[in-house]
Amino acid sequence: NFALDCVMKYPVGVYLAFHHHLVHAQSALKIHSTELDAFSGINAADPMTHMTHSPCYIVHEDDISKAARFNCLSLMMQPLDLLQQIANLQTICQSPPNFLILQGFGTGNLAVNDQLTACIEKLQHAGCAVILTTQVPFGGIDQRYAISQWTQQANIILSDCLGHADLYAKALKMYLQYDTVDQWQAHWHDHV
């Protein structure tokens, strides 16, 4: 099995293995829905020049069962009426995941009001970390726009990841390494 062979060959890290290609997960991007060469990214044999990872976390036996309970939901925000967005979040509040990833527009923009912020706070109080990222595959969140003030007030985690696979892996690492939303928020931006 290619993926298992790679575990022995490459240093500790997070990778994506697919159809005999191995790329750094931080850079992985799904580029085709049906082709076997479906992912793009920095080859695992090449060094990463943009390192945004936290210190390594060694997975232990008890982490495997904990990982099976990991619940992460990624919500691509659409140009819906704000009241519909709030209704969607209220539905999620009924059975919140551990992590809710909100994919904003462009640089991470998202229409908000007090009701939406209250839904986010309700999710956080229920043990759900809320992360804001962008739907755009390259670039990232840009704090020059109005998103910074409400994200600080709502205590939202801003993604510092290179892609969705990297973001998922980082959320899983936080879940395994720490136990509460407060800890996830406190350690999210810990870098080497």
Model-assigned labels for residue ranges:
Residues 15, 21-113:
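Accessory alpha-helical/coil subdomains and C-terminal extensions
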Residues 8, 93-94, 124-125:
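Residue-level signal for alpha-helix termini/capping positions
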Residues 114-192:
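ATP/nucleoside-binding phosphotransfer catalytic cores, i.e., glycine-rich phosphate-binding loops
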Residues 1-29, 184-185:
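Short, glycine-/small-residue-rich phosphate/pyrophosphate-handling segment
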Residues 1, 32-33, 147-151:
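Short, hinge-like loop/turn segments at secondary-structure boundaries
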